[in-house]
């Protein structure tokens, strides 16, 4: 029996392809289970966790080489059997999440039955964005003005 925990973390301010690497790992682990490399794959599902907020996009390559830039949905959506989890400590903008879910549905990905949101994730509201824009945090910290700062 094999069990894996793969963690993709970065220490750089800005893009370093964490999303692409995470997507590749989900694809690899999912296919390992399908090929029988993991004899207990049903008891060890592939889980793709997103921790963060809509201020950062992660590009992943889906079916047919289509590129997706995701800001809320975990990149593991590319594998139909992956469980998608937005973790505690994440910031969620429901407008962005809804837009991504709809876009993925139109592209042929059914994620609603496998997308979970931790009840301790922070819900961003338009007020958060306004407060950030009205402060000096955008200039001082290089904020993306998405309500996270």
Q: What residue ranges belong to the model's regions?
A:
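Non-transmembrane, aqueous-exposed alpha-helical and coiled segments at domain scale
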Residues: 1-148
